[in-house]
Structure formats: C-alpha cells, structure tokens
Amino acid sequence: MEPNTMASFDDEHRHSSFSAKICKVCGDEVKDDDNGQTFVACHVCVYPVCKPCYEYERSNGNKCCPQCNTLYKRHKGSPKIAGDEENNGPDDSDDELNIKYRQDGSSIHQNFAYGSENGDYNSKQQWRPNGRAFSSTGSVLGKDFEAERDGYTDAEWKERVDKWKARQEKRGLVTKGEQTNEDKEDDEEEYLDAEARQPLWRKVPISSSKISPYRIVIVLRLVILVFFFRFRILTPAKDAYPLWLISVICEIWFALSWILDQFPKWFPINRETYLDRLSMRFERDGEKNKLAPVDVFVSTVDPLKEPPIITANTILSILAVDYPVNKVSCYVSDDGASMLLFDTLSETSEFARRWVPFCKKYNVEPRAPEFYFSEKIDYLKDKVQTTFVKDRRAMKREYEEFKVRINALVAKAQKKPEEGWVMQDGTPWPGNNTRDHPGMIQVYLGKEGAFDIDGNELPRLVYVSREKRPGYAHHKKAGAMNAMVRVSAVLTNAPFMLNLDCDHYINNSKAIRESMCFLMDPQLGKKLCYVQFPQRFDGIDLNDRYANRNIVFFDINMRGLDGIQGPVYVGTGCVFNRPALYGYEPPVSEKRKKMTCDCWPSWICCCCGGGNRNHKSDSSKKKSGIKSLFSKLKKKTKKKSDDKTMSSYSRKRSSTEAIFDLEDIEEGLEGYDELEKSSLMSQKNFEKRFGMSPVFIASTLMENGGLPEATNTSSLIKEAIHVISCGYEEKTEWGKEIGWIYGSVTEDILTGFRMHCRGWKSVYCMPKRPAFKGSAPINLSDRLHQVLRWALGSVEIFFSRHCPLWYAWGGKLKILERLAYINTIVYPFTSIPLLAYCTIPAVCLLTGKFIIPTINNFASIWFLALFLSIIATAILELRWSGVSINDLWRNEQFWVIGGVSAHLFAVFQGLLKVLFGVDTNFTVTSKGASDEADEFGDLYLFKWTTLLIPPTTLIILNMVGVVAGVSDAINNGYGSWGPLFGKLFFAFWVIVHLYPFLKGLMGRQNRTPTIVVLWSILLASIFSLVWVRIDPFLPKQTGPLLKQCGVDC
C-alpha cells in the first residue's frame, strides 16, 4: 500500500473511530496527547484505547492491541519495557525515573484488566477455591466495600491506601519520600480511580478438571447409545414383537430428549460482580448519581388466591431496596380491578414511611417484614447501634398492627355488597364489574407524595388497572405486562425494568445493583436484553418431595445456557433492557477494515479490500447524514394542541431529551433509499408499531430513557390512562413483535425467544445471597396444576408460528440455544412414550413375555455400559454444579410423576385447542400466606383432581404385575427366577419413581382417601378379570391335551 494512501486511510479511520473518544477497555474518555492530537494506541486498526490502559497493557498485559493483536509500539513519554526497539523514538528515560500519578487519571493502575464483549478480562488473576479473585500481587478484587472512604475508619482507610502505594513503589511507578497532605489526597483519589476503572464483572469458567471429564463422558455415552440401538434394532423379541417395537420407539425418543437437554449444558460458566467498583464509577462524592433508573413491575390478578399481605411484603421490599430512591419506581398491576388491593396499597404506602428508614438505618435483610421477623436467626449479630433492639421491637409491633389492618380488609372483602363496593369518598368503585371497567391509575409516594418519617423522599408507587370491555381480548398476564410497559414509559421511562411476581420479594437489597454491573457495562450492556436471576423459594419441606425448588434447572441448565447466548426468561426475577422489549435489534459491533501486510503488493490490497473502500465511505457518509438529521430534529420542539397530548406537557430541551417532531422526520427522509426510510420510519409507521400516543412514541426515541425536565407528573396521567385503554393495541405490533408476546400462557418463553432470535444476549446472575425469594405450591394437586399450565404453554408454542423447530432459521439464534428452546416446547410430548414405557413392565409380568430376548455375555456389555455412562454423567454433573444428589433424585422422580399426569393432560388439551378451538381456563396458582401453627399443612392436604388418575393406575398396575410375576415363578418352579429378575427390576423402577406421589395420596394419616380407594377397587376389578384370563396359578402344560389324546387313542 502506498504511503499517501495509508495516511489518508488512517486519518479517515481515526476520525470515524474517535468521534466519541471513548476507551473500549475502561469506558473513559480518550484524552489528547502532548501535541494536542487524539491519542492513538494502535496505528494498525486505530482501536480506541486511552493512554493509561495502553501503558498498563504494555507493562502487565500481553503487550498487544485487544482487537488486532498487533504488538504495541512505544510512544513518547511512555515507560520502556523489555523488548522495545532501540530506535523507537527519542530517549526520554530520564523523565520515566520519577513518574508521579496525575489527578486526571492518565496513570496506570495495579490491577486493571481490559475487557471484551464476552467478559473475558485479560488480567493477572487467579481463581481461589473460596470464590474470590486475587491478583498476582495479592490485592483483593472481589471484596465488597462502600464506594468511598465513608465505609472505613480512618485507620482502615490509611492501611488500605498504604498497601496500594507499597505495591506501586515496588513496581517503581511512584517515588518514595515524604508526601504532603495534598499528595496523600491525590494518592487516595488515584486509588479510587484505579479501582473504578476495573471491570464491573468477570466470567469464571468451570475448572477444566471438572468440565473436561464431563464432556468426555457425554461423548462416550453418545457412542454407547449408537451401539445400544444397533443391538436393540437388530435383535427383536420375536415372541413379544409389539412390546419390543413400542419399547424401542420409546427409548429412541428418550435418547433424543436427552440430547436436547444435555448439549445446551456443554459450556457452563459462573459470573461474579464487583459492586464496589459500580459505586465508585457511578456514585462519586460531589457529583450527580449516574446509576440508571429502574421501573419495577409487580403483577397480580386475584387477591383471594394471592393474599394481599404477601403482595404488600413484596412492595415493601422494593421500596426499601438499596438504590437511589429517585431512580426507583414501583408499578403494581391489578388485573382483577380489586378494591381490596387498592386499599392494601394505601395502607402499604403509609407503613412504608416507617419501614423504609428502619431498613436503611440498620441495614437489615431481607427487607420484607413478614420474612424478616419470622427468621429464626440471631438478629443481633453484627449490630452495634444501641437503639436497634428498641427500634426493632417498636417496628415489629407496628408491623403486627399493619397486618391486622390488612386482615380486616380481607375479611371485609369476603362478602361483596349487592350495590357494589363504595370508596371512602362515597363514590362507587369503578371496578365493580371486573370484566367491564375503565382504566385506573393512582400514584402514591414519590417526589410529589408523602415523605418518610425522617423527611426523606420515597420511591414512587403506582397502582395500575387497565381498562377491560366485552369483546376485547386482554391476553392475561402478557397484556397486563405490556400495559405497565406503556404506563411506565409515559410516567418515568426508566431504561431498565425489573419484573416480579406478587409473591416474589427482594431478598437481597443489592439485587438491582448486581444487574447494573452487567447492564451498565460499556461493552456488554449494549447487547443485553435482560439479566435473569434464579428463583429461590420459602416454605418448602426439607425433603422437597415434589421438586419445588427446581434446583437442577436453575443451577445446571441455566448456567449452561449462560455460556452460549444466555438463559431463558422464566417469568420473574428478570431485569430488562427497554429497547430490547420494543423490538429493536442490538447494536452491531464495529469491525475494523481488513488490511494486508506491507510486504504484499498494492494490487492485492485493491483486490482484497480496496474495492470496498468507496462503498464503505459512502455508507459512512450516509450514516453521518442520518445522524445529522437526527441531531437537527433533536433541536426542534413544536407545541401541539391535539386532544391526545397534554396541554401542560413541557418540551424543554435537556441532556436526556430526544423528542422528535414526527412530521419533520417524514419530510427529512427525502433523498434516502427505502432501507434508510424504514430505519427512521414515518409517523404512520410509528403509530402502527407503538400505537396512537405521541408521548409514548417520543419516549421510545430517548436513548437513555427519562422524561424532559420540568414535566408535571400529574399532567401525564391522562396520557397514561390512554395507553392502557382496551382498544389501544388494535392494529399495532404489541404482543406480536414488541413487548410480551401473545399466543401462549407461558408468555415468558415466547418473549425471551423472540429477543434471542434478534441477536440479543442475556446473562445469568447468581449472587451469593439469593436476589429474590418466592412461594411455591407444596401441595401435590396444586403442584401438578402448576406444571400443567407450564406444559400447556409449551404445547401452544409448539403448534404456533413461533415454534423453535422452524422459526427464524438463518437468523442470529445460536444452534445450542435453539436446542434448548426446542427442548422447552417438546418435553410435554415425552409423556406419551413415558406412559407407555411405565406400563410395559406390568404387561410383561402379566403375560410372561419380555421386550428383550435372551442375550449372551457380549450383548450384555452394552446394557452395562449404558447404565454406567448414565451414572457417570450424573456424578460428574453434580461435581461441577454443586447440586446435591437428593435434588437430582427428586428431580428425576417428579419428571416421571409430572410426565404421566400433567404433561399428558397438557398434550391433549393443547390438541383440543388447536384442532377444535376448545380453550382452557387459566388457573392462578394459590399463594398461601405462612401459618406458624402448621408450616407444612398444605403438604399433607389432599385435593382430588383428574390428574391423579394416570399415576394411581400405573402404581396399582405394576404392583399387581409384581404379585402376578412372583406367583407365576413360584407356581412354575425356581427355574423361572432368572428371566423374572429383569421384569421385576423394571417394575420396581416405575414404583420407586412414583413413590412421592404415593406418599402424597396417603396424606398425614397414612391412609388412602376414600375416592382413591374407590378408583383402586374399580381398577383392581378390571385387573382381576385379566388375571383370570391369564390363569397364572395353573401349571403350564407342555404336552398334548388330555381330551384330544383320549379321542385319538
């Protein structure tokens, strides 16, 4: 390449790459060098890196550019390192011997690590067994501490800074000697800057000593399965051909199901966050707090099944979260238009004025009072304030009084007056008819509401009940969530949204900060659609009889997905990036232009990359033209007197304002091609996509969220009521392309799937203290109905256009991520082969036949190898995940119980809905409040449901088969015990897996309920007829019949 061509290219690329002047490593501004020019670390790819990061990479890193891996050359003023060329510029070593750190942050720091978009930071760190990350020089990176020196005593702070200075002196980066007070303050500031520039999180891969054997065994198991099926297919049981054929089909299905479940767990990872660095980077003393605002959504439907006291505790934990109060807003969706919930929020907002300052003063955890006061721990541990005991007793008494008031509201709501509910001011309650009522919004607390008892502001609390009218589809929970998205966009428009169920309280007050470590990361955050937290539960029996904790899914499957494209969305405990829900695609990574080495001829450069230069240049010019168009539109404001807008809506320009005049956008599209027109969209396209609300459309164009300054919240209520009207979503893309996607009762799977198909990534965050905790149905019938609803949602997705088997192939969804989504929608269909396979042992015992013919010693090796590989896979999976063997076994048992009951019914209900349009009613899972008198009373409570029939039948059938098989062996001699062993083992395998179900039927009294006894008698009568037909007690005659022999003789 010719010199002048290279120079022009460098100038052009430098100008385009450094227009923002943001370091791609630490996110800070790239400052100018001594000559007043923008500092360029790498002259090959011009990857933007600031001087401190450049110097640290040369001294402590791999000395190469993070993007093109070109060896960094020494710049004037930078310290020399081993390997620098002698003729690399003027020698300024005299200036390097006495380097001092500057206030502007241009010095290097000890433990800095550069990051890439996948979170792999190239730092000299070692992973220790206790889970903390230590640098090679011994500084603790993972220890949580407050952002500034306020969290330390003077002695502790001085000791910490002295240690940091000693490390710097040891490396020769600072001079020794006496320092003034001003120098010491500079050192402290530099130390904070150095820590703040560290990455906010890091990826911790599973140790190779644990994951490598696991992967090897998976491959071996796959090979063994191939040989096993080769043997099974080539050696049929000729005397029991139908049984053999059914068993082989079932086994092949199980193998495919195992592949779909196993391979998405190929790349499991862990992640750890650094909350101290988040605070130091975005919460500096004397500066405005730069943490991003968050809108929290809480959804509820029926206050009788979802107790108001549980919902109130969830709201209180949100209001008391450890986050700036002016950056938190809580929206409660009441889809049942219940006056009970409305009154509960009024009482909750009043109690929050005392509860929130108590939590923050004494730093209590958890911040849901019901669960805080019921914890059986030493609550005085680590408490040093002398007033704590007195204040705690007073707060507990106030909470008990608050609880009594809520109970009084619940008791009053049990009997509805004939004329309907009446509000305190005497006006009728608008939601007396739950299926025909207007939209309702009530704002509590916040900047314009009541302050706490200390005079401090509280987070905003908003009650939302969307409009419902006959003839309009409301789309259940998905429709309620979309309504909250629009209301929050009009009132607060936070860039991030936390979704919680009404029974999931915040157990870790720093949970939102944990998610911000990912979402506010300068590299990864732009491409994240959500941060998913695991679900943890209270009130589950120690044995976890029905696998309510779902540990295998949350601690194994989800961590495996985190290493691919991210975990699936599970419906609660998830922090969303608002643009991802609006249907936008993630930003595309900047790719450097390809260049050839100087040793190649120039014509090769032209052939390889030169021809695209003009095209790229034209594209960049048009992009800059588009940006200039937007920049001009940002400066324009226009007042409209349209009835749909608010008369008092302020359009003052601010740093966060990006309100566009949609008519100007349409006029400004002249001269651009169709692709660019579609990217900007005209006013009609905006309205078709988002609906007829100029205020909401304007909010979608604000890159960093927020509202214009001096906006009156009360004046926005009218527009908020408009966006939750029942007809707002008609002829829009809500529920189809944007927001929560409609079409299934498990809207969470569909919503996460669509975002991943667009190329978004997600992150799985597992803090040491669980972020959220909820309640789970420990009763057998309730648990089966919950699993039925999940399975029915998967079946609905399977028969929809969004089925992962055929949707969005060739898109941005990774293949292993697609396998995981396929597994989530096909698993209910496993119930059919599972039911058949669990029936085969009893049939074999009753008929005396078996699915496997007599085999030799060589053939038995494949059976033995298969069993050993299954056991080895389970053991190695437990080894890297930390899951207990009891959790794994309970998961296996409930896989069979749910498979032959709830999943089976879900398949037939789904088929009825698709083929005949028979819709099933959505049943809300009951969230019972805790009862100290009987903590696990629901565990032994029996509730009859048709879901209990198939498992009960299987248990009785296999028990009868065992009795018949043993009787047959005794009657025909002990020579039959050999073949009988395989049949008995098969039958006991079924019975052992169904044992928790059997205990659930017995209840507390260890006796079977009457209705189950009646069903058992009926089934026993049927099997008795079969028994008589088989006649197992009579000896089997192998010779000629006596009657026929007498005739012949």
Swiss-Prot record:
| InterPro entries, alphabetized | Cellulose_synth (IPR005150), CES_Znf_RING (IPR027934), Nucleotide-diphossugar_trans (IPR029044), Znf_RING/FYVE/PHD (IPR013083)
**Where, in this chain's numbering, is Mn(2+) bound?**
K477, D501
Q: Name one GO cellular component term.
A: plasma membrane
Which pathway does this chain act in?
Answer: Glycan metabolism; plant cellulose biosynthesis
Task: Share an example GO biological-process annotation for this protein.
Answer: cell wall organization
Q: Does the keyword Transmembrane apply?
A: yes
- List of glycosylated residues: N921
What are the entry keywords? Cell membrane, Cell wall biogenesis/degradation, Cellulose biosynthesis, Coiled coil, Glycoprotein, Glycosyltransferase, Manganese, Membrane, Metal-binding, Phosphoprotein, Transferase, Transmembrane, Transmembrane helix, Zinc, Zinc-finger
Q: Where is Zn(2+) 1 bound in this sequence? A: C23, C26, C50, C53
How the protein sits in the membrane? Multi-pass membrane protein
Q: Phosphoserine occurs at which residues?
A: S135
Q: What's the subunit arrangement here?
A: Interacts with CESA7 and CESA8. Assembly with CESA7 and CESA8 is required for functional complex and localization in secondary cell wall deposition sites. Interacts with STL1 and STL2, but not with GOT1.
> What is the recorded name of this protein?
Cellulose synthase A catalytic subunit 4 [UDP-forming]
Organism in which the protein naturally occurs: Arabidopsis thaliana
Q: Which gene encodes it?
A: CESA4
